[in-house]
Amino acid sequence: HVLHLMRGQVFEIDGKKIFAFGGASSHDVSGGILETDDPDFKKKKKMLDRGYEPYRINHLSWWEQELANEEEMQEGRNNLRAHDYTVDFIVTHCCSTSTQTLIGGSFYKPDRETDYLEFIKNYANYKKWFFGHYHDNRNIFDKEILIYEQMIRIN
């Protein structure tokens, strides 16, 4: 079975409570976000392709909704509150600001999503937190696991 875990929801799966919160800022956009209706789109794209500068194209490889909005964050807080901020597992795409700084120093910039997850980290009680945005496999602290290509049995 494949489940789409919606942002800010608490799911009970196999007797375990799981808080899910997707979303993250794209880090590979130093060349910018291109608009297909820009009269200079082809010229800009060609220049970026020649210089191997990473970029995204709005509505093709980048969407504004990659970050949660305030309504989704509030929904997550409300759902965690309904469970006394206690779940077995947290599954997110990115991680908290403090964990992100530990992983990448100043390379990754904090944003409203990592700050929101910092709040969750400070208030929620959980056994393990799984996230994968940073394309690596490693344990961060005892409770946070950066997962990319691995499959881990949780119980």
Model-predicted segments: where are they?
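Short, flexible, glycine/charge-rich loop motifs used to bind or transfer phosphoryl groups or to couple energy/partner
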Residues: G8-Q9, G76-R81, L117-I120, D136
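Short, flexible micro-motifs
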Residues: F11, S25, H135
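Conserved beta-sheet core of the metallophosphoesterase superfamily
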Residues: C95-N155
